[in-house]
Each structure stands twice: as structure tokens, then as C-alpha cells.
């Protein structure tokens, strides 16, 4: 990959052997947003002309675009070294050198930016190379360049480095999923944002070609390393990847505690990966600052005071956000708090305990307090924490994948370790937790790890601690010799003292500048906006394709039947006709059936669910469906899934099978904080032609008052259900979510039962918990439900129509529901009186509009529109400015993008130009586009000056038609004037102006502008070279089909009118504009 430059018109290009990604400069006003035009093209279609190499180095990709001091810079990686190889084809590189090339200015073209040499050893601290010397001081990108090349940034060309192994098992770099990358750990997200948006505008073939070029590079900050060694007869790779969060990034004393969004300082996800030819194992743990609002001054010599800045009540929201996101991402959380008993650290620990006790997630949060300084005197003392964490370590498990890429075991839960800075003490304990995990792996794989293995493990963890400490404090980690060698020494103590002095200096004198550079990289400075990437050709083509969709697509309607039943563990039966085949309901094309409590939720079933019951019900449902098909194709089972007692099965007509593809299934546990499958959801998705459908059945937390826990179950399922390539349930055209939601009616048994008997369902629905939670937006946003016209479906005495008569007297409720999202057409929603369970089954019918795209027709139309638009651009001009302008109107095409994309900066309007004004809505043109019906027509001077005043006068009149209003009659009586001699021109004109018998005196306040009252005149010509220069020639007023016109007056108003007419020798070329 190379970076090329064209100077006139200025453009940059990233080029490989087949394609080019070009960035064209755009003229900008002082207060306008930063904009450049992007273009992706095949070199075979558009050879690069006028480009030259701007760098002799290999380019590894671009980190994105950023605006600095009015210049738009393209940042490219020009130096890198391989530091890790997670698996055979998964390499990790450290960024060693970056270059900033201006898209719109040549000021820095002469500066040589590359300092990195592949001969520099990987451990060399590039921060000390002195690149920021006096000759670079004037560069606007110098601080960013120094940050990006300090050895703490990493990238991969082979896999998504922002995501841990357990979540990226279904991803392949043949089709990178930029939208699913973990932006929390993506440090160049701000710079790359517009490039990813540009990618989304491309068609399928172009997008695949762009992905194959690897032009875009996602960078993390933290640490990555791999050590290879022998374990028995196997070759093993031990890799460590630490990903530092960018959401509350900063330096030691300027970034503490939590923010209002729940993001904590120095949050790091560390993944230990063990890879061999037979398996690949991964284990994740995290660290982060105490999630409360606290600060600490860094200018004191010793004993920096800790200041808790918000009350317990004011901190709860942020605390809950932090742990809610952790639980949704990793499962249950075990906190290892290493703070001591000093006054400052003790106050943080006390506040942490208070928040955990008040948290609604307290059952999913375990706390272990371990005073590191008082407990640990040697490495062996660190083992004191083992009994405190071993139980959860076994429960959480690890991710295990066989050599065929199949997931055998998954990690459910995470250890969260913290001390004050989350550096030195944290690194020692995380090293121990990682060792506990690896010991479990050795037992699982029946292998033995010797001394050399553990020594390599300790060394790689010590290097990790040094790298993270250098990022946060500017120096390496304290106690690193303790981590490496397992003991304290005098040399290690002296080294720690030296680092402490270095930290004090850096914190007091350098942190502010480092913080500003970090904020600049992340796009967090005041009034900082991303560089807008404009792609007018694809914008136009995609807009036209949407308008002409019917030319390459077909539509048909498909009937869908959705049914849900909580079986309460009852046996399978075929007596389900009333449920699956209601009266006056035609057979559907697709049947979606969900069961809850298909088995009794005993501990044995929860641990290992028996699929036999599910198969029995599948057989019963399929037999019933095919029994109804007396003629024509029958029904086949498309797919089924089970999570303990929750089961989902989908049946479709055989005739539908050729249209269905990409069938996938997944599950999400929510019971016991995601560890147990007694509660949770099962989901199946597929594509019907080119329409995506997703069906979810779920069983949420029980309990009359546990609606908060049910809300949490919804959020866990909504965020945790993931299909291949990072697809979520919301990435579909139609979604149906149904099952036993367990939401109750907030009334008493004595109030509800009489209302049911009296048919007061609307009154009861006002107290329905799900209805209330949906109205407040807490659950199921953008989902809909048909009006409920049936009585509550829970809880009955089995075999009767009588609601619960047991001692508990459970309040009847609509626990069983069916919700939908998308433009489905609902037809019915009912319950059915089946008596096998304490629930009543429900069903709903829908009709879905299915779109089938003829890809060949779409491709032909795309190419036709694309080539047509490119030709229009080429005909208009060769400059990139016209590309911007061309997006508005070329050859009468509509203005597709009247304003630049807002991207959070709606207050800044596009600057006005000759063609557009910012105060005109919807991109209306600045000049009127009204034109006379033909060349023989002109504007009617008799119309009132106020365009809103009612009048019978037409807008246009013929050139041959005489106007008989008062002014035109007076003008018609003026005889034609003969040219005066040049020497008498001035006096002649003067005498004409003073003679009322020849020219009437103009009123002080004219009722119409001059250029509407006066007919066209022949413009005054400058004297020829042979004429006298002592005077101005008299005007030639020879009329052409119009009455004669008085000579031009000297008033500024009439002079401007004369200039307007003089600039258009042909009347048809005048930009006609109504007066306002």
C-alpha cells in the first residue's frame, strides 16, 4: 500500500495494486466545517494521473482524518512491528510510526516525518527519540504524532482486535464488520467515523473490494505480546492483550472515578489466550477505578488527599450504569478491592460497600476486600486471596474452542480488580487470577505446566503492568520486579523509588499537556468536529435507487402465525387444533411456536436440559400442521432451539424453502445473573428473500413486584443476543418477541377477579406492569402490541376456568404476550381455552411484505446511474469543488443534500454562496429559477411591486404588446434622440436632463424599480481607440419593438439596474426573480 499526492487540484490517494481511495480538497470558508470529497475507484477504470509518491515507506492503513488548525490531515501508519500472533493467521502489530498528510494544504509536504527503522528493537522507547525537536515544533500534528508513536497503540490486519475471542468467533476478516467493532476500545473511532460512514454508502461489490484493500485500520491502546514454548510435545502460544477504554481516558490525576455515563478511569480489559493445534482458550478480566465521583490532587509531595465530590444519592445513577453495562457484557461481577485502611482509601471502600448494598444488581455483584499492603510481604502471601476467589473462578469458567472452531465452554462472569490507581497492586493480583484460570485449563486439558511456563507467564504480566502504568502515569509499574521474580529485592525497591520520583514530576508538569493531546485524538475538545467526508456520486445513486426500487425488486405478502404457551411441564398432546387453527383463520406460510416450562425447572434440568420433551412437542405440532394440508405442499421444520424450559420452533411450507436462507439460532441466559438457564430467551433469525425476520421467545423473572428484574432481563437479552457477524435482534426488518414475560397487574386479587367477570379489561390494562414500563420507555422500545381483548392468561386452577384458589391467591395477569416491531400488518391477537396448564395459550397472526431483489437488475441500474453521474461530474468540471456543488443540481437533478451532515453540529450552517443561502430551507436556490414562457415574452411592468397584492395583471406580456398605463404612455411620447457630438455629450445630456419637455422628472419615491419601468436599452459602449477622450458618447436609443428609453440616470439605484440589464445581452439569459 502506498500514499500518493497530486498537487493540482490537490488530492491524496491510498493505493494498492488494484484500487485507490482518494481524498480531494475542497475550498473552505473561515467558519465552515472541515470537508473533503472521498472517492473509491478501481485503477483499471480510472488510472491515476498527476500523482506522485509522497512517502517511500510501506503504508499499513489509515487511522482516519482529523482537522488541525484549519487543515484536514490524513493519518497513515508508516511503521509497525509484529509483537503478537494470537493464532496462526492472527497477527498483532505495534504502531511505530505515523505520518500526517494534509488534504488541502501543501505547507508540510517538504517535512520528512518517518523516523522509524525496522532495525529499532521492539523494546525501544520511541518517546525518547527526540522527534519533537525545534524543527517540528510548528507542526500542528506534532503532539498527536508523539502520542501515537510512543509504543502503546496496536492494530491488526487479520482480526477485530477491539473484541475478545469469545465474541468474535463468528467474524472473519474476509468480511470485516466495522459496525460491530467495540468502540469502547477503539481509540481512533473519532478519526475513522466518517470513513466507516463512507463505506456504508458503497454497493456490495465496492464494499467487498474496499474491505479487501484493508485501507481502514482500527487501533487499540494498551498492551499485546505473545510467547511461544513447548508444553509436552505441543507447541503453545501464550498471548496477552490489554485494551484500555477510550471512554474516560486520561492521565493519572486528571482522570479519576466515574463519569455520569458510568465510564470509569483506567478501565482495562485484559485477555489471556492459550493457543495450540488442538484448542484455543481465552479468559478475560477487567480493572478500573472505583465507580464513584472522587478526585485527588497531584501537586502534593506525599499523601495526596482523596476527595469524594458527590453524595451517595447523587452517585447512584452513575454507579448503576457502570455495573449494568458490566453485567450485560460479561455476566456476574466479582470485585476484588485492594484498597487499604488509610483514611482516604477507607472512605472509598466504605462508599463502595454502601452502593453495592443499595444496588438492585447486588445479587450479581460479589465483593472481596483484600488489604494488599497489610497482607502481602512476599509473592507467596498473594496466594492468601485464592480461597476467596476460587469458587467464583470455577463458576465463571473460561472460553474453550476446539480445533474446528466450535465453542465448547463459554465464560460467564468476570473478576473486576481495583486499587487506587488500578496499576501496581492490581497487576500482581490479576497475574494471580490469570494463573488460577490457566491451572483450570491444565486440568481440563490434562496437561502439566512446569516452572518455565509459569516464568514466561509472570514475565509477560510484568511487561503488561509496565505498559499500562506508562500510559497512565508516564513511568513503568511499581513492584514489577515482584511480579517477574516473585520476590522483593533492594534493587527493585530502588527502582520503585526512582519511578515514584518520576511520576511526581510528570504528574505535576506534563499531565495537562498529555491530557489535551488525548482529548484531541478522541475528539473531545470544545468545538472539535470530525472531517466531513462527502461522496456526492454515491449519495445521488443510492437516492435514485431508493426511488426506483420497483424496477429491480418484487413484493409479496407472507402470512405468519405466532403462538406461545407456558406448559407448566405438562406432557405433549396433539389436541391443539383450537390454538393452532382458529376459526376464520387461513393456514399461514410460517408457524412460529414458543413454549415455556417445557420441562419442570428442577436443578437437574437446569444444569443439563433434556431435549426429549422438545422433540415430542415438535413432532405433535408438525403432525397437526401436515394433517391440515390435504392438498399442496406440506410443512417442514425449519429450525428449533431450547434453553432449559424455553423452546422455540419454526415450521414453514415446503414451497417457502427455496426463498429462505441464512437461518441462525442463539440463546441468552438471565437466571442467576446469566449463569443459569431457568430464565432467558431463545432466538431464531433468517432471511426470506431479501427481508430479515427474527423471532424471540423468552421467559422472564417471576414475582409480583419484580418488574425491575424483568426490565433487567429484557435489557440483558436485547443487548446480549447476538448472531453471526455481530448481528443483533434489531438488525432485522421484522421482529416478533413473545413468551411468558411475567409482568403482572398492580391490583389485588379481590379487585382483579370481579373486573374480569364484568369485562372491565380496559380498566385492568391501565394497571398492567408491561404497559406502564413500555409507556415510560424502559422496555421494548419501538415494539407494538395489538389491543388485548381476552382475559388474563394466568393463573388458573389446572383443568378449570377458575383463577387461582390456592392459599397464595396469585393475582390474575396477562403474563403471556406477543409484541412486534417493524411494518408487520397484524390481523388477530387472542387466547384459547386449553386446560393442560395453569396458563392459557395465546396466538397472533401477521402479514409481512417480503422484498425480493433482482441483484442483476440492481447492479445494471447502479452502474447506469453511477456512470451517468460520473459523466455529469466530468462534464461540469474537473475540480473537486464541483463534486461538492454537483451533489446539489446537475442537469436539472434535485438537490439531494442541501446541507452538510450535522453530526452533532447542527448549530453551524453551511456558508452562503452565490447559489445557496443558509437561511433558505430545504436547499432552495438563492436565485429565482422562474423563466418567461418564451423569448417573445417579458416581465409585465404593470404588476404591483408587492408580489402578494391581488391583481389581474399577468406575469408575462408579449414584446409586441403595448402597455397603456400612465408611465408607459408618457414614455411612448418621447421622440427618439440623435447622438450628440462627443465634444458636446456632457452638456447635451445635461440639457436633456433639465428639459421637462423631453424627459419627465422622476418622482422622489418611485412606485416601481427602474428596471421594471424602463424598457431595455442598448448599453453604453466605451469610446473606440480613435474617438475623442474628452467626453462620453451620447447613448444610442434606437428602439427595437419597444418604445424609446431615457438615458441612464446617475443615481446608484438606477446605475445598478442598468448594470443588471447590461450584463445580459440576451433576455432569455436573465435570472428572473420575483420581487419580495
Curated annotation (Swiss-Prot):
Region Disordered: list its residue ranges: 930-958, 977-1076
Q: Does the keyword Phosphoprotein apply?
A: no
Composition bias, Polar residues = 1065-1076
Query: EC top class, in one word?
Result: hydrolase
Signal peptide span:
none
Q: Which Pfam families match?
A: Exo_endo_phos2, Syja_N
- Protein name, per record: Inositol-1,4,5-trisphosphate 5-phosphatase 1
Which species is listed as the source?
Schizosaccharomyces pombe (strain 972 / ATCC 24843)
- The gene for this chain is syj1
